[in-house]
Every structure is written in C-alpha cells, then in structure tokens.
Amino acid sequence: MRDQEFWHSKWASNQIGFHLEDVNPLLPAYWHHANPKREDKVLVPLCGKSEDLVWLATKHDSVEGVELSQIAVRSFFAEHFYTPTVTPISGMHELYQFDELSIYTGDFFTAPVSQADIVYDRAALVALPQDMREEYVARLKQLLNPGGRILLVTLNYPQEEMAGPPFSVPLEEIQQLFAGYKVTCLNVDQADEHHPKIAKKGLSRFSEEVYLIEAQ
C-alpha cells in the first residue's frame, strides 16, 4: 500500500488525532441498518486500535480487522489487557487472535483476510488519496460475500479548502465507486460554525455522512 511510511510515522510519533477513545456513536446508531446477524463475518479495514472492534465483537462471533501499523495493533491488545495468539504469515503479515477478534498487521491489499458478510468502514476510504480509492473498493468487492453489506462513514467538505487525510469523499464519488450497488444515505451530520473543522480549519462546510452499500 502506498504512503505506508506516512502512517507508520503517525503511529510511531503518536500523532493519532484520527483515533477515537470511545466507540463511534454512529456505529451503534446505524449498525442495525446492515441487518446484522450474530454469525455474520465482519471486516474492519484499516482498523487502527479502534474501540469499534470491541463493540462489534460483542455482537458477532467473527470480527476481522486489518491494520498497517504493528504499534496500533499491539496497543489495542495491551490497552484491553487481551493476550492474543500471534501467528507470522509469509513474512509480510502477522495475525493476532483473541476470542472473536482477529487482526492482521500489514498491507490491506495483500492481507489473507476471510470473505466478509459486512464491512464496517469508518476511517479507511477517507484515509486514502483519490488515486487509491478505486483499487481499495475493488478489494472490498472481492472480499464481500454475495448479498454483503458495507456500512460506510465518510466526510464531505470542499477538498480545496483542506489537505487530507482525512479526505472528502462525497456521495457522487461513492456512487461512481460502487456502481451497480445499492447506495443509501442514512445520515448527514452537518457541522455548525462551532465545529473545530469550521472554527479552526476555516472550512466553509463540513459534514460526516453514513451510507449503507448493498450488493445486488
């Protein structure tokens, strides 16, 4: 995956403003729209050390994450006092396993993850520059079982007003990337003038948006 050194340096220097200390409230609020069943296999790309993994593991028997940074994965298990089984895979990846959770370290595009029934993407698509998104979405489609669903959280703002990441990925681009899939907007949270992205970054508008994407 390109820009690997960028993300390795972010984790190494603890510059992880993108990390949320708690479960993203949009996950429990909108997860039911994906019609989840306990036996559904869930994939979380570019998962970091997200608390969302813990929440998902209480709802599903199999949750797989993929994360480039070994620092992030080790921190996740240490902070939750989990002792995972660690298995090296082909010199390129490691698999960390604990109960319902499995996390692969290494490049998402080559990680040997299982086929998934539901993908949860809160911070993956928006972390990638535009020239990588088509390849990323192609990989998601490859990993999604027939009838699979994606719960996508994305951002929408004038890209020329702020350099990403996180990048702006508006509805029009989502529809292009997922042509042939059913795309449903579940929520648009439009920021007011007090939001840090507007008050401090000077953006003219900023919204966090939730989409359900379904294979047809």
From Swiss-Prot:
Any one GO molecular-function label of the UniProt entry: thiopurine S-methyltransferase activity
UniProt keyword Nucleotidyltransferase, yes or no: no
Cellular component GO terms, alphabetical: cytoplasm
EC assignment: 2.1.1.67
Keyword S-adenosyl-L-methionine part of the UniProt annotation: yes
Keywords: Cytoplasm, Methyltransferase, S-adenosyl-L-methionine, Transferase
Chain positions recorded as S-adenosyl-L-methionine binding sites: W11, L46, E67, R122
Top EC group: transferase
Catalysed reactions listed for this entry: S-adenosyl-L-methionine + a thiopurine = S-adenosyl-L-homocysteine + a thiopurine S-methylether
Location, primary (coarse class): cytoplasm
Localization, UniProt: Cytoplasm
Pfam families referenced in this protein's UniProt entry, alphabetically: TPMT
Domain of life: Bacteria
Biological processes annotated in GO: methylation; response to metal ion
Family: Belongs to the class I-like SAM-binding methyltransferase superfamily. TPMT family.
PANTHER family per record: THIOPURINE S-METHYLTRANSFERASE
Protein's recorded name: Thiopurine S-methyltransferase
